[in-house]
Amino acid sequence: MRIALTNDDGIQAPGLRAIYKALIEAGHTVDVVAPVTEQSAVGHAVTIAMPLRVKVFHENGFRGHGVYGTPTDCMKLGLSSLLEHKPELVVSGINAGANVGPDILYSGTVSAATEAAHMGYRAVALSYDSFRPEDISAHARHAAALLPHIEWAGLPERCVVNINYPAVPVESIKGVRVCPQTRAVWHDWYEHRTDPRGGSYWWLNGVIPPESVAPGTDRALLTEGYITVTPLRFDFTDSETLTRLASLEE
């Protein structure tokens, strides 16, 4: 299978290199178009005020296009202009840190997959529930083996399959669960600090209270040690409220 690979952690990130190696070893052809720099939490941002520049990375058996832009830039430019062949599947990841519940609104990883889906490609987002530097080569091999089992023929157009791996050894994973997103939200705050020169700055912090996470949702099952699989469709229309607002029509 020909696969286009991207991420938001950057083209040199361990997660991308791990899944690249695993996909190649599984017999796939992999074309990489990923950001040159760290782009976590940029969401679906697109570069419009400056040109996009591309750097080719070719080292130790790895080859890919590095884009000085966002994950969405990578997909728009890569799928329309850089890649010689259309992929059969787009994979975004493996991200350092889970993308569950409200995380998908901020995630460059999920946004890259979403952009690919909107362009008519089958797309998967892969994430690992830890920010610590860890060897996730076994998880990458597991993911490479899991992807061919997705039954795309039965899925609607522009669907993104969002897959998250728990931060446990592969042999300790309890299984795979297809589940909805949690509706729990982040409780954010900013820490006010002072730099060595006396200047003020603010640092974002936050937590999702565990008691607000409903059982059977992606965050709950991921914490329990399951791989979570959640299909995403980016239609933000609140269909239930449409009729309630009908009185505004003239």
Curated annotation (Swiss-Prot):
Its EC number is 3.1.3.5. A divalent metal cation binds at residues 8-9, 40, 95. The keyword Repressor does not apply. It is found in: Cytoplasm. InterPro entries: SurE, SurE-like_Pase/nucleotidase, SurE-like_sf. Its cofactor is a divalent metal cation. It catalyses: a ribonucleoside 5'-phosphate + H2O = a ribonucleoside + phosphate. The keyword Ubl conjugation does not apply. One of its GO terms (molecular function) is nucleotide binding. Binds 1 divalent metal cation per subunit. Transmembrane segments: none annotated. Gene3D superfamilies: Survival protein SurE-like phosphatase/nucleotidase. Pfam families: SurE. It comes from the Bacteria. Keywords: Cytoplasm, Hydrolase, Metal-binding, Nucleotide-binding. One of its GO terms (cellular component) is cytoplasm. Nucleotidase that shows phosphatase activity on nucleoside 5'-monophosphates. Belongs to the SurE nucleotidase family. PANTHER family: 5'-NUCLEOTIDASE SURE (PTHR30457), PHOSPHATASE, PUTATIVE (AFU_ORTHOLOGUE AFUA_4G01070)-RELATED (PTHR30457:SF0). HAMAP family: SurE. NCBIfam families: PRK00346.1-4, surE. This is 5'-nucleotidase SurE. It comes from Nitratidesulfovibrio vulgaris (strain DP4) (Desulfovibrio vulgaris).
